[in-house]
Amino acid sequence: MLQESIKKLVQYGIDMGLTPECERIYTTNLLLECMKEDEYIDPDCDLSNIILEDVLKELLDEAVNRGIIEDSVTHRDLFDTKLMNQLCPRPKQVIDDFNRIYDNHGPIAATDYFYKLSKASDYIRTYRVKKDLKWTCDTEYGTLDITINLSKPEKDPKAIAAAKNAKQSTYPKCQLCMENEGYAGRINHPARENHRIIPITINNSNWGFQYSPYVYYNEHCIVFNGEHTPMKIERATFVKLFDFIKLFPHYFLGSNADLPIVGGSILSHDHFQGGHYTFAMEKAPIIQEFTVKGYEDVKAGIVKWPLSVIRLQCKDETRLIDLATNILDKWRNYTDEEAYIFAETDGEPHNTITPIARKRGDYFELDPLESTCRHASLALAVVLQRRDW
């Protein structure tokens, strides 16, 4: 049974383009070592219609029986990641293949390759992602996507207790750091041995491009700073967003808000999220156009959306960045007590934005500039046109 499972897993790697045929024996021996097995007799078994989840379960059950791992979701996830890494190409090969495809066939072909690799390597556990609940709802603001994420494995009580008592480590500093690539993981940090990162340059600095293992939508990607540095919404944020969009114009890219009171992000590490998907907000129409003095070449308007959104469009992304920075600076310090908008209370700032960038035809687009306060886009549209600004 063990030898059949190993042969099937190696064949899966070959079929999916992870493992070259010439490395069949080499990969088989790597898996034998993982399973603490010295002997191997090539079994006669059906190698058609291999289901990865089933093969991994067979190997994990055997690893539990042999005392190699404990029988828990956490230990199984750590170990099957180790198994899958034996099939995967080294990081340099992935980078070289990505860049070659990008140069010869364009960005869409390159991201297609990388996304398929991330799924085939089981970094994205597609059989778990399928468990997520997804449906749409027609509203006055368009057809909204509603999802419930069920793909993150639940921690069992033993794993929770073990994580509490485990020795604390600061390596990697967080789950977004470059140092996660190839990391074996531990009881309180996921294994990332089958994880691969594409290095990119944005705003003249080193960043990483990867996919989210939980893919909330198609080609859900994460773009993160090569250094462990905090998130901050500023002019450089817009530059980084559009540098990425120029590299991958078929993707959108956005930043979560940089205030703890807003929540929903790892604020300790500068990063963005994006993907190849069209959300309802992108389709939402402009309900009121306006012009900002000095930026007449930038199209601006309020988006029909339940939250406060301003949409900016321009063929020259530098002009768009200039206006976005102007809006951000004014909004940070804007207070309107009658509208219950306060720049800060007790020294804690309240006003920030959630910028999302994309390319729409010949135009660069920043959509939205979403505030944390109600009716803010209308207020901004008015105050931006004041002569004293």
UniProtKB/Swiss-Prot annotation:
Chemical reaction(s) catalysed: alpha-D-galactose 1-phosphate + UDP-alpha-D-glucose = alpha-D-glucose 1-phosphate + UDP-alpha-D-galactose
Any single Gene Ontology cellular-component annotation: cytoplasm
Enzyme Commission designation: 2.7.7.12
InterPro entries the UniProt entry points to: GalP_uridyl_Trfase_II, GalP_uridyl_Trfase_II_CS, GalP_Utransf_C, GalP_Utransf_N
A GO molecular-function descriptor: UDP-glucose:hexose-1-phosphate uridylyltransferase activity
Subcellular location: Cytoplasm
Pathways per UniProt: Carbohydrate metabolism; galactose metabolism
EC supergroup of this enzyme: transferase
GO biological process: galactose metabolic process
Superkingdom of source: Bacteria
Keyword field: Carbohydrate metabolism, Cytoplasm, Galactose metabolism, Nucleotidyltransferase, Transferase
Predominant localisation class: cytoplasm
Family note: Belongs to the galactose-1-phosphate uridylyltransferase type 2 family.
Entries under PANTHER family matching the protein: DUF4922 DOMAIN-CONTAINING PROTEIN (PTHR39191:SF1), GALACTOSE-1-PHOSPHATE URIDYLYLTRANSFERASE (PTHR39191)
HAMAP family named in the record: GalP_UDP_trans (MF_00571)
Protein's name according to its UniProt entry: Galactose-1-phosphate uridylyltransferase
Taxonomic path: Bacteria, Bacillati, Bacillota, Clostridia, Lachnospirales
